[in-house]
Every structure is written in structure tokens, then in C-alpha cells.
């Protein structure tokens, strides 16, 4: 049975061969010159198609009894001309079963109209991605892969060389516009930034734009005529060389960059060659390079050698030579589809019966083309559902004026086969995708940071030393009467302020802070400096506030006491004492007790009373609570975060020209930064001004248990002036100058802390070192005695003491005279009564003289002298007062006065 069937098939073939073959007509358009379309592909593709027709017609196993014949026209890649040629194909006999088209513009207009006449269109040169639209082109198939198939290859190359930005330069033809849109969409999905520039005819303006945009990686989408114009302008604008990488379409001729004389480009061949060096091309594989024969029984290389014989010039200058294998395989695909259709048609329908309204033959032919699969000279030929050719992409680079294959990309698998043979003009690897902009964090220079940190460490160490020193000598009167607990808060605050300089100076030249830790650094800066200021200044403010309040209380008590003294003044008793000294000792003792009681009351005022430490703690705690509340609300609703303030770029002196430095200032910022700064600074400024006012008001007040109030006031003056001057300067004038900003802040903190600690603790340390503990006025039982007098009080005391000594001498002289008078009175009593009367009169006169001399010790003098003598001798007033209640009759009048 098998032998019989074979003989029947052979007999049928012989019969068909012996009979006159039936001619099947096809129409073809070929762009024989570039024209305005820019691709003269017909120059090589037409000979390739003719070669394929000859080979197909010579095969007895394909379309037996039929021969293929083609009617062709030169479309010049002009859509309008192509429409006229389509009209000729349709309305001039014979009937065409299928159409072959070349460039994309021509394919677009023919394939869009062909379904009306039930024609299948097979394109050997249409690469426009728009042609993949099945709704618009339902009967189109292409042996030329879509231009979109090269886009994944381009993206893989970008990723391989770590380029995150490139620019598309395209002509405005639809094929390139759609390719650019697809490439941009893929790039954005990969996180690659894409810029686009288009031109029509003259690319000069577009090249200037590329230069302004600092484009470095440029993908060109245009026909070869525009490609030469672009390359010439790239040379004139300097957009070539080691800093630039160009991607061109791979189906140009190998010497496409050499300008033909008729184009009159303003570039020589040498200039164009220089500009074209090291560019890349991507193109679908159009020629099989293996040794496996195709359906035509030729390998790809054999086909290329055979086609070369058709030309009398270098094939590099032949338009469409790379696409010729696609045109050759298109004829074979067409022939196989006809053969398939012949075998699948009903017996009563034959191929030669095709008309433009024959749907049966058209549908059968469409399905046969769609299912076509064979090995051609361009590789495996098959079509996708959209009619596109499925093929690998080849990447080449021009090196030394010749193209070298760099690798292949398989679209179906997504694998990039790379040979690592790429070369670069600079010899240092691929150039960057743009001018390398290196961010340079504007940090505090080491020349400022480390000396400041040194002084801060010394200040903290000094605070620790002073604390230990005062703890060791806490029993000394000068320490005990200065509120040491409040002063310890000052030391803590100063230490926190000094420690904050470590954080304010970060990041420095040698110390960097990660972005994740920067918000924590921001909050630490604010809180530590804020609490340090509150502790340090708040402790001093608490002192001047309490001094002011106690001074006000003392003034009220003094006013009340003066009112009482006006009604019953003790000086009347003193005058009575002086006037009745002789012979009236009980009365004199009573009057002296009344006078000293008034002096004792004047001495035990509010200013000399002990002060509880809790009063200072309450004030500092209240100020701290305000800061805690503000910071908590700030962090909760509007936290600080890292922001970068960018400054103008500059080119470093010792770097490559494609590298620039962008200074960046890292700042702590919140959404309502000005509001929070205003709240904090407003409160602190009011506190500073009020503290300065209180210091001025209490400048003359001396409290025994705040013995350093005068130095506290001076420290407040210093802090207020430095802070009120520095804050506006730092906030408004030098906010963006890192070193100046840090210098102002650090100097303010250092000066305020050093001067405050020095003013408050310097005199104490000096006193403790120079004055031994035995000289302190501290009683053995631990009760505190009188305070140390100031220089003014000491001078006043010396004057009153000298006056008192003078008065004491005068009193002694008068007492001596009184004693003499008494003796004379006794003698005269013995002689006679008359003499007694005379002596009595004489004594009365002397007594009168004594009364007049004793008035030199005025009430004011005695009022001041008695307490000052008591202060100088260290006597407790209670001891003297107890002696006043003693009825010892042996005391003389001088003893009573000199208490």
C-alpha cells in the first residue's frame, strides 16, 4: 500500500511538472532610495526576494504546478506613493494573492487597507511597534522583528552598566514614537529615569537641549539619514567621547556614518568616524551564523556570500543588506503558506481561483501563514499571535571603525549572553549616566570641633571637681550659707550644656551620623541643651527671686517697725540713762535693757533668717516642668526629622570634569519649626529679661544665707547678654554656615558656663584655701553665728568703733572728775555746813557739765555701736540680754553703757 501511494505521488508530481504551471502573483514594494523616509532597504532586499523566488520555483516539492511571480514598485518609503501603488496592485491585472512591504510607513498604510480586499500582507522591513496592533492590522505578518523587541535588550544593558538615567532622541515617525513610548514604560518599571527629545529634519535644537540637560547615555531612534545628521551635530556640540555613550539602530549599514556627497553634511568622514567610535547598536538577529542549512539548503553565511555577488560595490554601502535575509525568508514563508493553503482548500477550490472577495481562500491562507514555522537563513522563522517575528537580539559595538559582537539577548527567556569585549575611551570602565554629583555634607570642621570638645571636657571636669571640693568642705560657713543644694543644680545644668556641644557639633569631618539615627540626635540636641539651660539659669534665677521676695518682706516689716518706734522710741530711755547716771543704778539698768532690746529686734531681721532649700527646688522644678511639657508636645505632634538644604554645585579642583560637588546641609526640621522655636525662645527671653531686672533690683541686698547673691546677679547679666545677642544671630544670620553657627553656639555656652561657675565658686574656693576653718564664726555646738561683713559694712564698722573709743575716753575722764567731786564733797562735809552747801552747788555745776559732754554719744551712734561691737566680738545677743536682767549692784555706769 505504501509503495502504491508513493508511486501515485510521484506520478502526480510528474504530471504537474509536465503540465503548464499556474502562475501565482504577488505584489511587492521596495524603497530603492532613502528619500524622506530614510531607508533604502530595497537596494539589497529586492535582489534577495528575486533570489528566493528563483529558489522556490525550482523546488518540485513546494507548490508543484505553480510558479510565483512578483510585481514590484519603488515606494521610496513614502506612504502617499505607496497608496497609489496599492491601487495599481488592486485594479490592474493580474490578481495578487499576497503583498510584500518594506519600511514601516509603507507597511502601515498598506496593511491597514489590505483587509478590505482579503489580502494578507507580509512585511520584511516593517519594525514599528504599532504594527503589532491586531485590531488595526488584522492580516499583517512580519519577518522583521518589532522594534519593541530591542527595548528589553537596551534595559538589560542599562542595568548591566548601572545606568539609572538615559535620554531618547527620536525622529517623529510613528515607528520611533511608539518604540520610544514602550522603551520609556519598561524603563520606568525598572526605576530608570528617561528623558525624551524629538526632532523633525534638523536635529540641531534637540542636540542643544541634550547638552543643557547633561545627557550622557543617549538612545537614538531614527532612520540612517537622520542618524548621520545627529552624529554630525554630536561632533559639533561635543556630545561624544569618553563621557558619552550612543545607542543606534542596528540595521544601518556598517559604514552608515560615512556621509555621502549628496547630503552635504558639515562634517568630514574623519570627524564622523571619531564621533561614531564606541557606540552600541541593538538589532534582532537577521542572519543565522551557525552551520545548519536552512530550508533553502543554504546556511546564513552561504546566502550572504551568494547575495554579495549581485553587487559591484562594498556591501557595507548597500542599503538593506543586513535585512536581506529577512526578505529572502519572507518569500519562503509566503511559498510555504501557499503550499499549505493548496493542500487545505476544498477540492473544488484552487489557489488560482482567488478573488478579492474570496473569504475561504483568504481565511485558509491566513491560518497557514500564522502556523508557518521553518528554519531560514535568518534563523528560526515563526510568528506570534500578533504576527510579529520571534527572534534574538544582537548587541554590537564599534571598535576601531568596525562592529564587534558584544552578546545576544533572548527575549523569550530573558537571558543576556555577554562576551565582555566592550571597550571604553577612558579605559576606566563605563562612564556615568550623568555628571556625577557627589553630596558633600557640610559638617563642623575638626579645627572647630575638637578644641571646643576639649574645653567642654575641661568644663565638665571642673564641675565635677568643684562638686567634690564643696562636698568635702560643706561645713565651712561660706559654703553652708550659699545654698549649696541650689549651686549643685547649677553644676548639673552647666555640665549638660557643655555635653550638648558634643551633639551640636555632629556630624563632623570625622564622625558621620546615619539617617536612621539623625532624628534621635535632633531631639537629644534640643532636650539636653534646653534642660541644661533651665537647670543652670533656673538655679540662679531662684536665688535672685528669693532675695527679691525677702527684701520686699523686710521693707514691709521695716515700715511697720518705724511706725511703732515713732510712738515709743527706745532712745528716750537711753537719754534718761545718760542723764541719771550718778546714784541711780537700778534706773540706769532698766533703761539700758530697753535700749538693747530695741537694737536686738532691729538685728534679727528677715534677711538674716535661714532659708529652706525646698523654695529653690520648687522654682527650678516649675521651670523644668514647662520645658518637659513643651518638648513632650513637640515630639508627640510634630517630631523633628532630617532635612537637607542643598547649595550650588561646584567642580572640585582635583577631580575629573564629569564630577561635581553638591554641598548639603543636614538639618533638624519639623513642620512647624518656627512656632516651636518661637515658644521656647519667647519663654526663655522673658525669663532672661526678668532675671536681669531682679538682679538689678536686689543689687544692694545682703542675705546671710545667700551670701553669693551679688555674684549670682553678675552671672545672670552675663548669661542674658550673651544669649540675647547670640540667639538672633544663629537663628537668622548664619543659619546655613556650619562652622560659624557652631562657633557662636559653643562660645556662648562655654563663656556662660565658665563665667557663671567662676563667679559663684571662685570666691568660695579662694576663701577656703586662704582662710583656715578656725577663723570661721561657727560655734562649737554647731549653731551658725553672724555672717561675714562686706567691705562697706567693715569700713562703717571701723569708723563707728573709732568713734566709740573716743567717746569712751571722754566718759572715763568725766567719771574721774565726778569721783574727784565726790571726794571733795566728803571733805567739805567734815568742815562746815556752809562749805557743804557750797560743795553741793559745785558738784551740781560739774554734774551739769558732765551731762553736756555725754550728749556727744547720740542715739544714732549708740544704736549702731552696740550691735557692731557685738558683731565684731562674736557675742550672742542672748548672753548680754541675760546680764541686763541681773541685779548686780556693783556695776558702774560705764559698765552699763559699754555693753
UniProtKB/Swiss-Prot annotation:
Region: Disordered, residue numbers: 870-899
Residues exposed to the Cytoplasmic side: 469-487, 547-616, 696-713, 763-899
UniProt GO MF annotations: G protein-coupled GABA receptor activity
Protein's membrane topology: Multi-pass membrane protein
Signal peptide (from-to): 1-19
Pfam families recorded: 7tm_3, ANF_receptor
Biological process per Gene Ontology, one example term: response to xenobiotic stimulus
Glycosylation sites: 69, 266, 339, 353, 371
Major subcellular site: membrane
Transmembrane helix in keyword set: yes
Domain remark from Swiss-Prot or TrEMBL: Alpha-helical parts of the C-terminal intracellular region may mediate heterodimeric interaction with gbb-2.
Subunit text: May form a heterodimer with gbb-2.
Reported function: Component of a heterodimeric G-protein coupled receptor for GABA, formed by gbb-1 and gbb-2. Within the heterodimeric GABA receptor, only gbb-1 seems to bind agonists, while gbb-2 mediates coupling to G proteins. Ligand binding causes a conformation change that triggers signaling via guanine nucleotide-binding proteins (G proteins) and modulates the activity of down-stream effectors, such as adenylate cyclase.
Family named by the database record: Belongs to the G-protein coupled receptor 3 family.
Protein name according to UniProt: Gamma-aminobutyric acid type B receptor subunit 1
